[in-house]
Amino acid sequence: MTESTSRRPAYARLLDRAVRILAVRDHSEQELRRKLAAPIMGKNGPEEIDATAEDYERVIAWCHEHGYLDDSRFVARFIASRSRKGYGPARIRQELNQKGISREATEKAMRECDIDWCALVRDQATRKYGEPLPTVFSEKVKIQRFLLYRGYLMEDIQDIWLNFAD
């Protein structure tokens, strides 16, 4: 740590760090708190910021006030991003829970998102296993396992074979 940064108040250093973290991508409040509490890698190894709990709360409040930190925006973008990567609603819910997002906020965002999960599950299955999808039981089980791992719901997975005859 340089001489000038060691003289800066802990609040200013935390605020600077929070803005740099949030400039890269949106984070949940819990993620930001965890990253702010983590030691900073300095020239001589990890260095702690000796900030009080009040400093952390002021930084979080400032980020909320100035629009840098918004859990609802984070949830909406996270759902869109993960669904584009081929993950289903169950897996997305689990990941949001791990990131400290409440179940109510997650369910609200899942209802508001405009994602056709049935189309996505079919797209994932055909991308991985080709068109037409196998009808042999052992192959169907393999596809179901893959799609369940990706976080899709069993009723959506079974619909791809029900609509297969169309």
Curated annotation (Swiss-Prot):
Residue ranges the record marks as coiled coil: none
InterPro entries the UniProt entry points to: RecX_HTH_1st (IPR053926), RecX_HTH_2nd (IPR053924), RecX_HTH_3rd (IPR053925), Regulatory_RecX (IPR003783), WH-like_DNA-bd_sf (IPR036388)
UniProt-listed GO biological process terms: regulation of DNA repair
Chief location bin: cytoplasm
Record keywords: Cytoplasm
GO cellular component, one term: cytoplasm
Protein role: Modulates RecA activity.
Family the UniProt entry places it in: Belongs to the RecX family.
PANTHER family reported in the protein's UniProt record: REGULATORY PROTEIN RECX FAMILY PROTEIN
Xref: HAMAP family: RecX
UniProt protein name: Regulatory protein RecX
Lineage: Bacteria, Pseudomonadati, Pseudomonadota, Gammaproteobacteria, Enterobacterales
Recorded name of the encoding gene: recX
